[in-house]
Amino acid sequence: MSTQSLYKVPSEIAANALVNDEQYKKMYQESIVNPEGFWREHGNRIDWIKPFTKVKKTSFDDHNLFIKWFYDGTLNASANCLDRHLENNADKLAIIWEGDDAKDQRTLTYGQLHTQVCKFANALRSQGVRRGDVVTIYMPMVPEAAVAMLACARIGAIHSVVFGGFSPDSIASRVIDGNSKVVITADEGVRAGRIIPLKANIDEALSHPDVNCVEKVIVMKRTGGDINWVEGRDIWWDSLMDTASEHCIAEEMGAEDPLFLLYTSGSTGNPKGVLHTTGGYMVYAAMTHEYVFDYKENEVYWCTADVGWITGHSYMVYGPLANGATVLIHEGVPNYPSPARLGEMVDRHKVNILYTAPTLIRALMAEGKEQFAGFDGSSLRIMGSVGEPINPEAWRWYNDVIGHEKCPIVDTWWQTETGGILISPLPGATDTKPGSATRPFFGVQPALVDNMGNIVDGASEGNLVILDSWPGQMRTVFGDHDRFVLTYFKTFRGMYFTGDGAKRDEDGYYWITGRVDDVINVSGHRLGTAEVESALVAHEFVAEAAVVGYPHDIKGQGIYAYVTLTKGSVETEELRQELRQWVRKEIGALATPDLIQWAGGLPKTRSGKIMRRFLRKIAANEVSNLGDSSTLADPAVIDTLIETRLNRSE
C-alpha cells in the first residue's frame, strides 16, 4: 500500500486522544494474552448491583458451545444509562431531537429521560408485562422509541425493535417468533415528507392468522392522523403516562439474562432473532463507543442510524447513554428536504462526532459538494462510517467535504451478531487508509481462513473468522440454538464465521470484501436473498426466482432478480413493475428489486443447484471471464442471460 494513501493521525487529535498507537498496541496485546485480567478491569466501567467475580467462560467448539461473560454479576441496563448519571448530571442533555421538519425540536435531560422511562416502565407493568416477556417496538425515530427500549430493560422485559420500513408480513413473522404480548407503535411516522402508516401496518400484521399472542397495543400520538382503533386492545401512550408513577426500581438482572432480540436476515429466508444479553453487551457497547469515537465528556454525538438496526441500539441508545453523552436523534433522513440538511444539522447542534453510512455519503456525493457551500463544520472532531465497506472515493469525499481534512474517519466493521464494533481505527492511534477497517478492537482476534478452514498468514485474502469470544457477542438465535451453532460455528470448526470475506495487507490492515453467503447488503442493511426469492415466487405468475446483489453507485449493493415466469405468462414492463410492488408489500421498500431480468432458465448443476456465481457476475456486468461452466446441466442458459442482461455499462 503506497504511503500516498495513508492518512496520518492529525497531531491535535493524537495529543488529546484516549489512546495513542503505542498504548493501543500494549492494550491489545494484553487483551489477547490475558483476556481474563483485561476484561476484569474494563468490566467495571459500568455499575453492577452484585459485582462479578467470574469473567469469561467461552468455547467455540460446535459440539460444546458456550458463551458467558461476567456471569455471576447482576446489573440493570436502564440504570446504567440513566440512574448512574443523576447525582452529577441530572440537568445534562441526554437527547436532542429534531423532527423531519427542522422546526420540530425537543430536548430531554438525563433527569427528564429517567422520569419518562420510570413512568413508561410502570405503564408496561400495568399492561401485564413481566420480566422475560418479549415486547415488540415499531416506532418512528422519536425519543419515545428510546424511552420504550429503556423501560423494557428497566423491568427485565426483552425488547424486539422492528425497523419502521418493514411490511406487515415482516412484522407478523417477528411478533410470532418472539411470542410478543405487547406491541408499542405510533399512529403514524414522518420521513422525508411522507407519512408512514405505522398503526395501520401493525393492525394488518396482527390480523395474520398465526398471530394470537398480542394482548395490548400501546399507541403514541405522533401526527394525530386518523387511525383504526380496536377497543380493549389498543391504548394511548399518553393515557398510560398520565397515571403512571415516576418511581420504578430497576430490576436486578443476571449478566446473562436477555436484554433484547433483533431480527436479522438469514440465508434460509426466515429472519433470525439475534439474542443479546445484559452484562457483556453493556460493557462492550459502552467501551467501544468511548474508545472508537474517542468520546469526551460534554460532546454532542450524532448517529444517523435508525433505532430499528443494531447501530441504533448500540451507538444511539445503550453505548452513548451509558457514557453520559448528549445524543442527537433525527426523525427524518439527513438529505431531506435538500442534501444540505446534514451540514445544517451538524452546525445547528454543534455536533462533535458524526456516525453515518456510506450509502448516505454516496448520495450526497452525487449531489455535488456545492450543496455544502454554506457548511461551517468547525464543531466536528471525529467521523465514522458503518453498515458496509466504504469505497475509497466516498471515503475521500467524506474526509474532504464534510471533515474539512481535519477529522479522523473511523471505518467500523461489525454485525448485528457482534453487538459492537470489532474492527476499526482508533482516532488517536491508527493511521488510516481509505476503504480499510484497519485493526481489531481490544480482545478481538480476527483471522483469515481458506475454504478448508486453514488459517492463512501475512498479506492474504480469505474468509473472515474470529478465533475467540468478546463480551458483546450474541448468545443464541432465539428459540433455535441449533441454527446458531450451524450458522456461525459449523463452517469452520472452533471459529466464529462472520459470513464476510476480507483481505489483509502487508501492514496487517483488514479490508472487508463483502458477503460470501447468500446475504446482500443494501444501503447498509442486510437482506437474505432467499427472503426476496420467496416473496417473488409467491406471485402467481412466477415459477422461479434467483436474487443476487450487484454494485450500485448509491446503495453499495442493489437487488438484481432473475425471474422465470409460469407457462403462458407474458413478459411485460407492467408485470415487472407489479413484481417490484409485490416484493415491496411482502417484505418492505428496502427489499424492492432494482432490476428484474426475465430468465427462460437459470444456470443449474445436474443436481438442480443454482450456480449463483454466474448470476452475480452477469448482474455485475462482468461477463468476459465467467469461469468453468462444464458442471452446468445446460451451459447455453448462460449465453441467453448475458444477451438479455440489464446492467450494461453505457
Swiss-Prot record:
The modification N6-acetyllysine is found at K609. It comes from the Bacteria. Keywords: Acetylation, ATP-binding, Ligase, Magnesium, Metal-binding, Nucleotide-binding. One of its GO terms (molecular function) is acetate-CoA ligase activity. Mg(2+) binds at V537, H539, V542. It is an enzyme of class 6 (ligase). Its cofactor is Mg(2+). GO terms for cellular component: cytosol. This is Acetyl-coenzyme A synthetase. It comes from Shewanella halifaxensis (strain HAW-EB4).
